[in-house]
């Protein structure tokens, strides 16, 4: 593996994990804040709001896991190296 390809792969892996964590992190914070506000306004709808929140948090967390998978592929099974 050439030095330039190796350095670019490490940089791309770091960017993949970093950017994949920032977006869902902001989204999860916004969703949790909105859920707390909704439960405060309508306490009787807590179960429905909580279920929807947990499902949406799982989908958001999947985006972070996809970024981690991309980073691991770039580090250990690099398709750009012959």
From Swiss-Prot:
InterPro entries xref list: ATP_synth_csu_bac/chlpt, ATP_synth_F0_csu, ATP_synth_F0_csu_DDCD_BS, ATP_synth_F0_csu_sf, ATPase_proteolipid_c-like_dom, F/V-ATP_Csub_sf
CDD domains: ATP-synt_Fo_c_ATPH
Pfam families listed in its UniProt record: ATP-synt_C
Coiled coil segments of this chain: none
Bilayer topology: Multi-pass membrane protein
Regions that span the bilayer: 7-27, 57-77
Major place of residence: plastid
Swiss-Prot/TrEMBL site (Reversibly protonated during proton transport) positions: 61
MF (Gene Ontology): lipid binding; proton-transporting ATP synthase activity, rotational mechanism
GO CC annotation terms, alphabetical: organellar chromatophore thylakoid membrane; plasma membrane; plastid; proton-transporting ATP synthase complex; proton-transporting two-sector ATPase complex, proton-transporting domain
Subcellular location: Plastid, Organellar chromatophore thylakoid membrane
Record keywords: ATP synthesis, CF(0), Hydrogen ion transport, Ion transport, Lipid-binding, Membrane, Organellar chromatophore, Plastid, Thylakoid, Transmembrane, Transmembrane helix, Transport
Superkingdom of this protein's organism: Eukaryota
PROSITE patterns from the UniProt entry: ATPASE_C
HAMAP family recorded: ATP_synth_c_bact
Subunit structure: F-type ATPases have 2 components, F(1) - the catalytic core - and F(0) - the membrane proton channel. F(1) has five subunits: alpha(3), beta(3), gamma(1), delta(1), epsilon(1). F(0) has four main subunits: a(1), b(1), b'(1) and c(10-14). The alpha and beta chains form an alternating ring which encloses part of the gamma chain. F(1) is attached to F(0) by a central stalk formed by the gamma and epsilon chains, while a peripheral stalk is formed by the delta, b and b' chains.
Family: Belongs to the ATPase C chain family.
Function statement: F(1)F(0) ATP synthase produces ATP from ADP in the presence of a proton or sodium gradient. F-type ATPases consist of two structural domains, F(1) containing the extramembraneous catalytic core and F(0) containing the membrane proton channel, linked together by a central stalk and a peripheral stalk. During catalysis, ATP synthesis in the catalytic domain of F(1) is coupled via a rotary mechanism of the central stalk subunits to proton translocation. Key component of the F(0) channel; it plays a direct role in translocation across the membrane. A homomeric c-ring of between 10-14 subunits forms the central stalk rotor element with the F(1) delta and epsilon subunits.
Full protein name: ATP synthase subunit C, organellar chromatophore
């Amino acid at each position: 593996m050439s030095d330039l390809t190796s350095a670019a792969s490490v940089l791309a892996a770091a960017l993949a994990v970093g950017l994949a964590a920032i977006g869902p992190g902001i989204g999860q914070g916004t969703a949790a804040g909105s859920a707390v506000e909704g439960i405060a306004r309508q306490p009787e709808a807590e179960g429905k709001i909580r279920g929807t929140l947990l499902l949406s948090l799982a989908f958001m967390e999947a985006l972070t896991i996809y970024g981690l998978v991309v980073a691991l592929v770039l580090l250990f099974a690099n398709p750009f190296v012959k």
